[in-house]
């Protein structure tokens, strides 16, 4: 029995995780070359792929603007903040974005593929599942990170 190939397609949804997705996440995590990464499911390749990256100077508002109003996405965001002890910290948030206006098929597809992706992206500190912009307000991140 072989345990290699953890990025093989998920048995339920049939979606794997593209190598580029893992590499881009590592660039965000270790090299700080991205502020955020937005992922989408490419049904033709049966993989979760990178849709967009944000450079380190982009704001949280830029990140939110990159999430579609009517379709599901996954995303990771590198959140920098200062603690009450005045220490600079960084936490990585994983977002499962599933707006209420997205289609049922997309919601099911993204829901069944989420665990596979989050297993592949080692080093995520917090996960947020959101269906509308109020659930991804910057204050939500501040509360979770502190």
UniProtKB/Swiss-Prot annotation:
GO molecular function, one term: actin binding
InterPro entries associated with the record: ADF-H, ADF-H/Gelsolin-like_dom_sf, ADF/Cofilin
Phosphoserine sites (modified residues): 13
Tissue specificity statement from the Swiss-Prot or TrEMBL entry: Expressed in vascular tissues of all organs.
Keyword Cytoplasm recorded: yes
Location of the ADF-H domain: 14-146
Domain of life: Eukaryota
One biological process term in Gene Ontology: actin filament depolymerization
Swiss-Prot/TrEMBL keywords: Actin-binding, Cytoplasm, Cytoskeleton, Phosphoprotein
One term under GO cellular component: actin cytoskeleton
Transmembrane segments: none
Subcellular location: Cytoplasm, Cytoskeleton
Keyword Cytoplasm in record: yes
Modification after translation: Phosphorylated.
Biological function: Actin-depolymerizing protein. Severs actin filaments (F-actin) and binds to actin monomers.
Protein family membership: Belongs to the actin-binding proteins ADF family.
Protein name: Actin-depolymerizing factor 6
Organism: Arabidopsis thaliana (Mouse-ear cress)
Phylogenetic lineage: Eukaryota, Viridiplantae, Streptophyta, Embryophyta, Tracheophyta
């Amino acid at each position: 029995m072989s345990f290699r190939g953890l990025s093989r397609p998920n048995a339920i949804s049939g979606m794997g995780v593209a190598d580029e997705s893992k590499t881009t996440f590592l660039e965000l995590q270790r090299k700080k070359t991205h502020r955020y990464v937005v992922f989408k499911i490419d049904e033709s390749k049966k993989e979760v792929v990178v849709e967009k990256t944000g450079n380190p100077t982009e704001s949280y508002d830029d990140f939110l603007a990159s999430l579609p109003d009517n379709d599901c996405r996954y995303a990771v965001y590198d959140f920098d903040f200062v603690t009450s002890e005045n220490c600079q910290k960084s936490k990585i948030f994983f977002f499962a974005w599933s707006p209420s206006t997205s289609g049922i098929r997309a919601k099911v597809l993204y829901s069944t593929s989420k665990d596979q992706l989050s297993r592949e992206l080692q080093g995520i500190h917090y996960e947020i599942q959101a269906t509308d912009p109020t659930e991804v307000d910057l204050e939500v991140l501040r509360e979770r990170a502190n």
